[in-house]
């Protein structure tokens, strides 16, 4: 049931005898987008094979030729178990980015067997971010540097995304989580040329306490949420740089936006968080892809409760990015 897309069947076998196939003991399935259950969904459209690729929590890949029906799950990771990731990490919030002719699978890897302290000194499973590399979008994605943890080992980091500056240097943007520092922050660190190590130390772009719309009103007092997660970098047609992020309002997830004041490559800021959320109603983990006709599409995870069961499904929205700030035009029809 390998999806060819655009008449270009890449074949099931990639180099080293590795096979683009489902996890052991799991059969391939075809799932309609409306029935897909996935936390932290991320979609990438590849013009070379006219195909869509979706990844999410769990680390597996789904493939589609039309956005409506998806074939999967495929196991695309071949990480080095001797690295800090270990043999059985919990994988969340993956993204796939192309840079320098290669594909990079960036994700949060959690080690339930390794503890770090939270803000109160209580033990918390170690959680950090790393990039894996492949020559093909379908993998296999392999460890770049087994001896590098990339980020500070004691830091609870999650939700990595990718950026490039005007000199071609690459960066990881991620969150230092509020459970540990009490005020979640969006941070940036420069990659080495192969994206396997960091160059220098990370610095803060903006923090949860700058987000004035988040949190709850308790006893007449506004209590802001320390949650700041799922950053995603974008640039408008007017060359203004922004970052999507997720926080909470009234106990539900919502998506916000921050803009830099220094143009297309304004990583250093200053950053200003918009006074109102971009999207509310239990939505989070926003990202953007460009469709075959140039349409900019917002991908979010929509959380809903049915019969006491919490489910998250991908939702797509059409974006207008032609001015200095992005706007949602409505649900994306495909």
Question: What is each stretch, according to the model?
Answer:
Residues 5-334:
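Carbohydrate-active catalytic/glycan-binding domains of CAZyme proteins
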Residues 1-3:
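Sec-dependent bacterial lipoprotein signal peptides
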């Amino acid at each position: 049931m390998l999806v060819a897309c655009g008449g270009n069947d890449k074949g099931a076998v990639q180099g080293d005898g590795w096979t683009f196939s489902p996890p052991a003991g799991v059969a391939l399935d075809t799932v309609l987008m409306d029935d897909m259950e996935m936390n932290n969904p991320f979609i990438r459209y590849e013009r070379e094979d006219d195909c869509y690729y979706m990844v999410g929590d769990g680390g597996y890949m789904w493939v589609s030729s039309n956005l409506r029906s998806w074939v999967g799950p495929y196991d695309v990771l071949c990480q080095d178990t001797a690295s800090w990731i270990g043999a059985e990490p919990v994988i969340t919030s993956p993204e796939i980015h192309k840079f320098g002719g290669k594909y990079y699978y960036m994700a949060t890897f959690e080690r339930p067997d390794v503890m770090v302290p939270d803000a109160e000194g209580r033990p918390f499973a170690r959680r950090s971010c790393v990039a894996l590399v492949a020559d093909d979008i379908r993998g296999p994605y392999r460890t770049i540097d087994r001896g590098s943890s990339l980020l500070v080992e004691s830091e609870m980091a999650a939700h990595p995304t990718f950026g490039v500056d005007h000199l071609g240097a690459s960066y990881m943007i991620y969150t230092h989580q509020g459970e540990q520092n009490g005020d979640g922050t969006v941070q940036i660190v420069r990659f080495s040329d192969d994206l396997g190590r960091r160059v220098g130390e990370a610095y803060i772009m903006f923090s949860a306490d700058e987000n004035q719309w988040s949190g709850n009103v308790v006893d007449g007092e506004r209590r802001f949420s320390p949650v700041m997660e799922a950053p995603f970098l974008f640039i408008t047609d007017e060359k203004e740089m922004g970052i999507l992020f997720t926080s909470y309002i009234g106990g539900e997830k919502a998506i916000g936006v921050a803009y830099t004041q220094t143009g297309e490559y304004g990583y250093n800021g200053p950053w200003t968080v918009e006074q109102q959320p971009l999207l509310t109603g239990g939505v989070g983990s926003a990202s953007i892809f460009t469709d075959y006709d140039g349409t900019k599409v917002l991908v979010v995870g929509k959380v809903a409760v049915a019969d006491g069961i919490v489910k998250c499904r991908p939702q797509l929205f059409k974006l207008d990015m032609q001015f200095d700030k992005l706007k949602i035009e409505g649900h994306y029809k495909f």
